[in-house]
From Swiss-Prot:
It comes from Cupriavidus pinatubonensis (strain JMP 134 / LMG 1197). The keyword Hydrolase applies. A motif (Nudix box) lies at residues 38-59. Residues 168-200 are annotated as: Disordered. SUPFAM superfamilies: Nudix. CDD domains: NUDIX_Ap4A_hydrolase_plant_like (cd03671). The lineage of its organism: Bacteria, Pseudomonadati, Pseudomonadota, Betaproteobacteria, Burkholderiales. PANTHER family: ADP-RIBOSE PYROPHOSPHATASE, DIHYDRONEOPTERIN TRIPHOSPHATE DIPHOSPHATASE. The gene is rppH. Its EC number is 3.6.1.-. Accelerates the degradation of transcripts by removing pyrophosphate from the 5'-end of triphosphorylated RNA, leading to a more labile monophosphorylated state that can stimulate subsequent ribonuclease cleavage. Belongs to the Nudix hydrolase family. RppH subfamily. This is RNA pyrophosphohydrolase.
Length: 231
């Protein structure tokens, strides 16, 4: 569903815990990290779409979170032609997003990455609110910065503190290795040893991914992905 200007309505979610740390999800089989987000279906309000995406992507229910704030208006970004499927070039321009800031009211163990048959993430972590965005694909960096900046006014303390290590959780719950890798950064050689997740999430076949979306939803790749139509 596109608006008259060629933008797809979408919601983005910045989920914070009691320490104002932000939730990042690791895309299945990749070293790329993103915020939960997804398109608004016909007839949905942005808030309804947000709750649906929250459950589909990380298994949380409305009682697990509290809405702290949302952006005043749509935040838009355009997608370069090389990242758009040929058959929709000239019609699709990019995404317009309402971003929500949510505070976790539940526990870490309430996060469930396999709430649907087609999970988006195979691991997740909490990170400090302000992190460098160089790893975000270039045409999305401004939207991430705008959303984080606008919504930071709702935080109950100054989040501008030095970056600290954060934990990695695999599958539904459980702790993995702790290291100071920022979202989207490739691991060092010492960090590349296989992780032992509590719950494995089955890989999604690349062929199936390619037909599910116009372009990646808020992906933070280690390097820009060559295939822009992956989900």
């Amino acid at each position: 569903m596109l608006d008259r200007e060629g933008f797809r309505p979408n919601v983005g979610i910045i989920l914070i815990n009691a320490r104002n740390e932000v939730f990042w999800g690791k895309r299945i089989g990749e070293h790329s990290w993103q915020f939960p987000q997804g398109g608004i279906k016909y007839g949905e309000t942005p808030e309804q779409a947000m709750y649906r995406e929250l459950h589909e992507e990380i298994g949380l229910l409305p009682e697990h979170v509290r809405i702290v704030g949302r952006t005043r208006d749509w935040l838009r970004y355009e997608v370069p032609d090389k990242f758009i499927r040929r058959e929709i070039r000239g019609h699709y321009r990019g995404q317009k997003q309402i971003w929500f800031l949510l505070r976790m009211a539940g526990r870490d163990c309430d996060v469930h990455l396999r709430a649907t048959e087609h999970p988006e993430f195979d691991a997740w972590r909490w990170s400090d609110y302000w992190v460098p965005l160089e790893a975000v694909i270039e045409f999305k960096r401004d939207v991430y910065q705008l959303a984080l900046t606008e919504l930071s006014r709702f935080l109950n303390r100054n989040p501008r503190v030095p970056l600290s290590p954060y934990g990695v959780h695999h599958g539904r719950h459980g702790s993995g290795q702790r290291y100071a890798q920022q979202p989207g950064q490739p691991p060092t050689l010492a960090q590349r040893r296989p992780l032992q997740p509590v719950t494995q999430v089955a890989p999604v076949a690349p062929a199936a991914e390619a037909v599910q979306a116009v372009e990646s939803d808020a992906v933070l790749p280690a390097t820009p992905a060559p295939n822009p139509t992956e989900s």
